A protein has these predicted regions:
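Charge-biased low-complexity segments
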Residues: 1-88
Length: 88
């Protein structure tokens, strides 16, 4: 639900580069930690088939800025999330 609300931001990362390369498409998998307070202290690129550093960095940066609901319990949660990009 959190990413659904921010999907427009993630798509802007992609759309800017799509103008330069109309064939640009692929998947970006970001691995990140949701801390006990809902912040994201760590996020990094786990895998990609997009092979576009600008989009990949933008997506990782936006994930890092995202606030999530606090995880159950007192700990943190590790998540791997795939973002699929392709021309509409």
């Amino acid at each position: 639900l959190v990413f659904k609300q921010k999907m427009g931001i993630f798509m802007r990362c992609y759309q800017r580069e799509l103008q330069r390369n109309p064939e640009l498409k692929g998947k970006v998998v970001v691995r990140f930690v949701v801390g006990a307070d809902g912040s994201v202290p760590h996020a990094h690129l786990r895998a990609t088939s997009l092979e576009n550093n600008v989009v990949e960095s933008c997506v990782v940066d936006e994930v890092s800025r995202t606030r999530f609901p606090r995880p159950d319990g007192d700990g943190s949660v590790v998540v791997s999330y795939p973002f699929n990009f392709g021309p509409l």
